[in-house]
């Protein structure tokens, strides 16, 4: 399988990635294992999931259980921010939620780090700089290699990138690798 550079991250990802939304919802552990084994045999090394996939955590749990010792050979991307409960309290981009959500994802994925951790959708209740600060903290702790975003409209994406650039200029060093 052809590998391509993932932006300026230094990561080399397979030309095809595997979306893991069906794991834990339509596919049980055995079927998930078959899909992942086939994907890895075909040369796929990029696996994309989210904490809400597979009925709130099921996809990450099955992916973590299946990868095992192959974790070092793959690029794991997961998202946070969509509601993990019926009331919608376990959601968003607040610092408090981001820090707790990553711990839950790390546990389900059975890994010490996430290669790409990204906000699933905009959180109108949280300033983007708060979310970026939390992601920066996770990068400094080694829990997240790169931060990104998903489903942000162009103007919000531009604002997020400007906030990240401004903070980086102020700190005189780059601590978080933001790819959104």
For each predicted feature, which ranges?
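N-terminal small/glycine-rich loop or linker at the start of catalytic domains
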Residues: 7-23, 77-90, 113-118
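Structural preference for beta-strand elements that scaffold enzyme active sites
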Residues: 13-17, 45-46, 73-79, 113-116, ...
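Beta/alpha (TIM)-barrel catalytic core signal, keyed to glycine-rich beta->alpha loops juxtaposed to Asp/Glu
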Residues: 126-180
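Active-site groove signature of glycoside hydrolases
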Residues: 106-126
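Active-site mouth loops of central-metabolism enzymes
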Residues: 20-30, 84-99, 120-126
